[in-house]
């Protein structure tokens, strides 16, 4: 697992609002010596089946997102990250999203107490993801 700053006490209430973020593929930018950073697209297979990121949400996040608007209250979500597996680590060595692929993982994430749910914060096994495309999206 990626070492993290101990902010869980501050964020405890947010972790009570767990959700799923559906996806069929996701990208990480590959860095080249010339400064270019084209995206590399990952999925469970070439068919790009549905999977889910481990998400958290809050309905009342107060912040200044645009100076002209001042402080606003927004509903926000984010997804958790963890250490990368082999496939993602070659492109992005620091982290990858926490991904659920089974009904049991989904049920656990959505229903159990936070300490037990956080045990799901781990990378997919090596070989579970495939590079399905490189470069800018061309499918929409």
Go through each PLM region and give its residues.
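A structured binding-face within diverse protein domains that lines the active/interaction site
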Residues: 1-140
